[in-house]
Amino acid sequence: MNLNNLENIRYNEIKEFSDKIKKEFTFSQKKQVMDIIEKLNKDSRKNVIKLGQALEKFLNKYEEELKRTNNMYNFDRRYGNNYLIAGVDEVGRGPLAGPIVAAAVVLDLNVEEMQRVFNIKDSKKLSEKKREELDIIIREKAISYNIALVDNKTIDERGISWSNNEVLKRAVEGLKVKPDLVLSDGYAVKNLNIRNEFIIKGDSKSISIASSSIIAKVYRDSMMKEYSKGLNMYGFNHNAGYGTEEHVQAIKKHGPSKIHRMSFLTNIL
């Protein structure tokens, strides 16, 4: 759109153009968008000026996200630019039902800035829709990824601590490439024959750990929704097996299902 005669362009057309910029924006267009913002801010119409202000706010937010993402990539790269680094994380340690799931992800940490995966953070801080969108992008861009699980019966037999370590180990060992380094969230993975560094609050610092957190979360939530189709009385589709009041009352009323962790129900039954 040619904005040289901006005063002659209807507001709705300008808004449609502004919305398109937000949807299709890439950082290479920054200067062009800044010029557009300047023109919008000089318009005599208040609603057009507000479009310019909104576009400027969008650009600032984009730059903040770019900086945050770059910091997460750089955090991993500091271990070695030419290293294959895997991030590994688990989800489902605390639920009363279902498996514990882990994912390991190896990203290309040396891709150009605009080829990086944006908006990645701790999976718990993302909406379900955003997690599912990022899950697809991460899988497409990863050099390798692997998902592993330990089911509820094994958790009962071996205990949650063993199961937690085992699922992380399986996730890493199932990768199609062998990483030079494994970054884990919070604590080290025992009996792993690969160099391992644990990062406190790693899912908010490391791009590799945060990516694995998202893949594990989306995979497990999907599993629990499938289980819910045959066990809808427990509400697995929205509680993911965690001990909500609704879930606890359903266990007391209907008894445990085949996917409940009996060792977690001693105070309920």
Swiss-Prot record:
Pfam families cross-referenced by the UniProt entry: RNase_HII
Keyword Manganese attributed: yes
Gene3D superfamilies assigned to the protein according to its UniProt record, in alphabetical order: Ribonuclease H-like superfamily/Ribonuclease H
Source organism (scientific name): Clostridium botulinum (strain ATCC 19397 / Type A)
SUPFAM superfamilies: Ribonuclease H-like
Cofactor note: Manganese or magnesium. Binds 1 divalent metal ion per monomer in the absence of substrate. May bind a second metal ion after substrate binding.
Binding site for a divalent metal cation: 89-90, 185
Entry cofactors: Mn(2+); Mg(2+)
GO CC, alphabetical: cytoplasm; ribonuclease H2 complex
Catalysed reactions, as listed in the record: Endonucleolytic cleavage to 5'-phosphomonoester
Protein's UniProt name: Ribonuclease HII
Function: Endonuclease that specifically degrades the RNA of RNA-DNA hybrids.
Subcellular location: Cytoplasm
Record family assignment: Belongs to the RNase HII family.
